[in-house]
């Protein structure tokens, strides 16, 4: 048995998410079927994590096992992209790995990126690829709020009601807030995240940036661990799984 890691880029707009669902088209199933077709054996793809419907990836990581060694990886990548590119999926690379490697369990850090377009007019080019916010946001307040999130905390406040994680305790390694002209980029780094955690944190930072909340209220919202008090989560369209570190 041989194991291969694949790095994947995709636009999640037209998919139900990464994971195979009973209804709708998933990214996982789309790639699995194409691999099965080309390699002429049933392939099961294991991702580093699930992305929800509408969420994109700059470099999702996954692995699959195959009986025989792939003779020409470059040819396989080209063939995969021939079928997948029209569906807004791109295979960046395929690498041979040992059988101890696991796309999810071997990950040391995950990086998510969230894009906000902060101007009066929405972007035509980045339609459904970023969150358009008309009201001018206070970047300094957002930066101060983001620093309060760094460290090991009980993130119950930002946890989806249907989150299946055993514990709400997570360690956020770092948060970066960068503005380029009218686009704001928020980057979050952690070994693992709770379901909807990033989108919920961005939604709360938006309230802070709009001055609907002051910094003290933002801190209290985190401490209270009450989902009813939290701001609405940011839309999926602005969220990107950026990179998996092993």
Model-derived segments and spans:
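Structured-RNA-binding interfaces characteristic of tRNA pseudouridine synthases
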Residues: 1-246
């Amino acid at each position: 048995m041989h194991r291969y890691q694949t790095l994947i880029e995709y636009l999640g707009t037209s998919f139900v998410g990464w994971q195979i669902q009973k209804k709708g088209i998933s990214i996982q199933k789309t790639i699995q079927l194409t691999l099965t077709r080309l390699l002429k054996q049933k392939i099961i793809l294991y991702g580093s994590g699930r992305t929800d419907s509408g969420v994109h990836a700059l470099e999702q990581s996954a692995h699959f096992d195959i009986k025989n060694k792939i003779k020409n990886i470059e040819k396989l990548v080209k063939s995969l992209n021939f079928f997948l590119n029209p569906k807004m999926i791109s295979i960046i690379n395929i690498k041979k790995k040992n059988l101890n490697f696991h796309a999810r369990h071997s990950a040391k850090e995950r990086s998510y990126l969230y894009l906000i377009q902060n101007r009066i007019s929405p972007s035509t080019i980045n339609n459904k690829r970023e969150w358009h916010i008309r009201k001018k946001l206070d970047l300094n307040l957002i930066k101060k709020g983001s620093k309060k999130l760094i460290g090991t905390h009980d993130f119950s406040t930002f946890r989806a009601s249907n989150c299946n994680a055993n514990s709400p305790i997570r360690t956020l390694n770092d948060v970066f807030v960068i503005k380029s002209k009218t686009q704001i980029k928020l980057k979050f780094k952690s070994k693992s995240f709770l379901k909807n955690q990033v989108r919920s944190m961005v939604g709360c930072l938006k309230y802070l940036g709009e001055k609907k909340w002051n910094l003290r209220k933002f801190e209290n919202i985190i401490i209270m661990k009450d989902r009813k008090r939290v701001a609405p989560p940011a839309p999926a369209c602005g969220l990107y799984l950026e990179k998996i570190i092993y």
